């Protein structure tokens, strides 16, 4: 899987970086966990502070567009971010821990 950063903006009001990316892959759409691990390595971010908001694939294409946010503080992340998005990202992390 390859990830290309489309845009990387700093949002000082919400104390976060907003990253739009394009993930190209072979086979099945990668999980949020797989994309998150790759983004953490590319962006030099903490895994706990990175939230993948969307990961959308167009039918028949081997690429997915995504939107991720990197927060400076966990307290701000929990205040600003929707609970459903946080749960989606936490479920992927819980699955990773269960596999180990």
From Swiss-Prot:
InterPro entries per record: Nucleotide-bd_a/b_plait_sf, Ribosomal_eS24, Ribosomal_eS24_CS, Ribosomal_uL23/eL15/eS24_sf
Family to which this protein belongs: Belongs to the eukaryotic ribosomal protein eS24 family.
Listed Pfam families: Ribosomal_S24e (PF01282)
GO cellular component terms listed in the entry, alphabetical order: ribonucleoprotein complex; ribosome
GO molecular function: structural constituent of ribosome
Biological process according to GO: translation
Gene3D superfamilies: 3.30.70.330
Transmembrane parts of this sequence: none
Name under which the protein is recorded: Small ribosomal subunit protein eS24
Keyword annotations of the record: Ribonucleoprotein, Ribosomal protein
């Amino acid at each position: 899987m390859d990830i290309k950063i489309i845009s990387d903006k700093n949002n000082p009001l919400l104390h976060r970086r907003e990253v739009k990316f394009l993930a190209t892959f072979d086979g099945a759409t990668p999980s949020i966990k797989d994309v998150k691990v790759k983004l953490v390595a590319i962006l030099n971010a903490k895994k706990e502070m990175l939230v993948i908001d969307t990961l959308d694939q167009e039918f028949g294409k081997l690429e997915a567009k995504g939107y991720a946010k990197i927060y400076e503080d966990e307290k701000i992340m929990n205040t600003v971010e929707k609970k459903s998005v946080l749960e989606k990202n936490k479920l992927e992390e819980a699955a990773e821990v269960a596999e180990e």
